[in-house]
Amino acid sequence: NSMLEEMKGWINESLTNNEWRIIGKEEYLKTVELLESFYNYLPKQLIHRDIHFGNFLFSKGGLSGYIDFDLSQRNIRIFDICYFLTGLLAEETDNAFTQNEWIENVKSVISGYESVINLSIKEKNAIPCVMESIEILFIAYFISVKDTKRAIDAYNVFHFIQNCESDIKNT
């Protein structure tokens, strides 16, 4: 699978079947077109594809590993970073993060990642769009399982990320 194929495939189908009630077709198309414009230039590697705190193992106060590899695949390298960071927003309720607080988390995660391997300029510029695409994926998924509340929550996270785009690119 590739994120781009998913966006154009089952995600589009789910949103179309829902008659674009949660996210507008124009917002979806704008995001897909942007993703498509750089997708083939982004480095690919084996990714976990479900990185969140529930899949982390801790021992003696530190990270000791992670579990749940059933979604692992070869995909864009920045997917796991973006998924983890959007997951922080999704796990919070009642706007627990201000925009500035969340951007500090973004900076910290990217800095930690880059302490091991640097991201390219193209990858850094793609991060907001990949995050927005992940939220569109969740909108489509929650629609497909008839969970309108969580689909709307994902849409709200999508807009939160849109409002942070320039700050994310400057990390």
Regions found by a protein language model. Give the residues of each.
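Active-site catalytic-loop/activation-segment of kinase and kinase-like phosphoryl-transfer enzymes
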Residues: 1-37
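Hydrophobic core segments within long, regular secondary-structure runs in both alpha-
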Residues: 29-32, 103-110, 158-165
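Active-site acidic catalytic loop and adjacent metal/ATP-binding pocket
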Residues: 32-79
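Residue-level preference for long, well-ordered alpha-helices that form the structural scaffold
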Residues: 17-20, 24, 98, 102, ...
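All-alpha amphipathic helical-bundle segments outside canonical DNA-binding/catalytic cores
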Residues: 119-131
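ATP/Mg2+ or Mg2+-diphosphate-binding catalytic cores
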Residues: 138-171
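Conserved ATP-binding subdomain of kinase catalytic cores across diverse folds
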Residues: 1, 115-118, 122
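Active-site activation/catalytic loop segments of kinase-like enzymes and analogous catalytic loops
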Residues: 78-117, 134-149
